[in-house]
Amino acid sequence: QVGDDSGGFSTTVSTEQNVPDPQVGIKGKANRGKMDVSGVQAPVGAITTIEDPVLAKKVPETFPELKPGESRHTSDHMSIYKFMGRSHFLCTFTFNSNNKEYTFPITLSSTSNPPHGLPSTLRWFFNLFQLYRGPLDLTIIITGATDVDGMAWFTPVGLAVDTPWVEKASALSIDYKTALGAVRFNTRRTGNIQIRLPWYSYLYAVSGALDGLGDKTDSTFGLVSIQIANYNHSDEYLSFSCYLSVTEQSEFYFPRAPLNSNAMLSTESMMSRIAAGDLESSVDDPRSEEDRRFESHIECRKPYKELRLEVGKQRLKYAQEELSNEVLPPPRKMKGLFSQS
């Protein structure tokens, strides 16, 4: 039976448990709670177990059944908008003092290495095509138990902005930030923020295939700034992690070769590449008999070729049967020694 360890064999590592101590002999004040004191009991109606009492009364059930032919899973995993519509890691930074701001540009160029350049999936994706046009979704995850007032805003390329990649006091006025569309938040009330960065550029599109860093080239989408206030670094920890994703309005133009194509595996034997699984075969896989018959019926040049071959086989078969079953004349009777006269 499953889970029966009577035979002395178990797939799980046995852990030696502490012997129950009915006399409440726990040593140390830090390891002693109110429930460990003798005579103290839980209040009437209080739940002392982790399990939810509501779930214990529910009838076990599975997903609702659907009619045959009705699809339950409707997400298209081959769609670029589905895959890149999920948030992918962009950057992270930590504040060390109060009343500071941090600005980072969203540069699509592949020549800039992290942390100033796109990392991982984003770097690979934005080099699969020449030009990008459209808005982007920015997700900001806040880490740390703090009660800090914050403000985030997006600055298009070419407008006034604080020094990127440096934690410093902002030199911009509050009126200027508000005109750009600032978003205010409090870290005690929210742990994540999602902002749709607009497509606001004097260019028709930006490219990840160009060199450059910052806002001096045609590869920068824009700059994002985050400012904080009421932050005490001595007893608090505040960190921001940013993630980027495309939107349904994103447009990708002119596919190109993947990044780092010179790192692809090279060999003189094509069969070894196919055997290694990194190269598709140039011919189709062996088809089933049903597929072969179906394709033979829709062949337009000689639609009755297979039929004529099959008829020829049957004619040869019948001819062989006729030869083997041909009626021969009865044998002649011979007079021998034992024949009666």
Curated annotation (Swiss-Prot):
Biased composition (Polar residues): 8-20
Signal sequence, renumbered to the chain: none
GO CC, any one term: T=pseudo3 icosahedral viral capsid
Single biological process term from Gene Ontology: symbiont entry into host cell
InterPro entries to which the protein is assigned, alphabetical: Hepatitis_A_VP1-2A (IPR024354), Viral_coat (IPR029053)
Region (Involved in P1-2A pentamerization): 270-340
Disulfide bonds: none
Residue numbers marked as site, Important for VP1 folding and capsid assembly: 273
Site positions per UniProt: Cleavage: 1-2, 269-270, 340-341
Superkingdom of the source species: Viruses
Ranges for region Disordered: 1-32, 321-341
UniProt keywords, alphabetically: Capsid protein, Host endosome, Host-virus interaction, T=pseudo3 icosahedral capsid protein, Viral attachment to host cell, Virion, Virus entry into host cell
Annotated family: Belongs to the picornaviridae polyprotein family.
The name this protein goes by in its record: Genome polyprotein
Species the sequence originates in: Human hepatitis A virus genotype IA (isolate LCDC-1)
Organism lineage: Viruses, Riboviria, Orthornavirae, Pisuviricota, Pisoniviricetes
